[in-house]
Structure formats: structure tokens, C-alpha cells
Amino acid sequence: MDNENEFTGADILLKALKDQEVDTIFGYPGGAVLPIYDAIFGQNFLKHVLVRQEAGAVHAAEGYARSSGKVGVLLVTSGPGVTNVVTGLTDALMDSIPIVCISGQVPSHLIGTDAFQECDTTGITRPCTKHNYLVKDVSKLSETIHEAFKIASSGRPCLLYTSDAADDLLC
């Protein structure tokens, strides 16, 4: 995966997670993140823990971070997937637990149109995260993920949130 132009956003995301030595990710599938789940299925370095609901993913990532000393990582879909993790994100922020939450988003041309399962993910998560991103350009995805891990694990450890527009995952 040397040339990012040859890979989908999902491939680039997985390479960035591998670069960060992530071995476990917690999550619940949904339409906006299915390309990531397809990529997870085709690799062998990352263990995915399927939870029953997104809130379980964020709390599992908290427990993983506390017990392992690593950054906890979770993956949720857009809309209700994001809103279901707000309590856990706030808990992680208040307890200084290093977590990176990755969510899907509707295609960038649909942002702001009340598309199916669209919500203002960055606005909703701004008060309960150390920093958040909305990645609309797949060429910035790897850089953003690496920066998220750096911020999550430096200073006061805390939570980072990144939302990937659906078209980035398919590029």
C-alpha cells in the first residue's frame, strides 16, 4: 500500500490503523461504514469485536484502553451510530481515556441536505471530544488518522473523533 491513489479510503484507513499498531477495534456495522467492514474482512492483523449497540463499542474501547495502555478504537456508522456513542465519548473525555472513534458519514455532496442517517457529527461530538475531524478528501485520510492518534495519546490523553464521508471510503 505504498501508493494511496491505488487504494480505497477503507484500505487507506486500515493501513493507517496498522501503522498505529492497532490490533483490536470495537464496532457495529451500518451502511456508511460497510466498505470498511469489507476491508476488515479481507485482512488478518485487526481483530474486530462486534457489539450489540454502538454504546457498547465506546465503553468496550474505554475498557480496552484502560487495561492495555493503548488507544482504544471504535467504528460506528453515521446518524444514529454517532448519536449512540455520545455518552461514552463524554465519559472517556472526563476520565482522560485515549480513544479514537471513527464513524461513517453520508457522501460529501449530501452533507447538509438531511440525507438518510445524516447528522452534524462534528457539531454533536465537539463538546465531548478533545478534537474532531470531518474528512472530505481521501488524500487527507491517512494524515488525519495519524494526527488523531498523536493527539489522543499526547498531553491529557483523551478522545478523538473522525468522520469519513461515504464517498471517501469508496474512492
Where are the language model's segments positioned?
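N-terminal alpha/beta PP-like core and its mobile active-site loop of ThDP/TPP-dependent enzymes
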Residues: 1-163
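Single conserved hydrophobic/aromatic residue that forms the stacking wall/gate
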Residues: 161-171
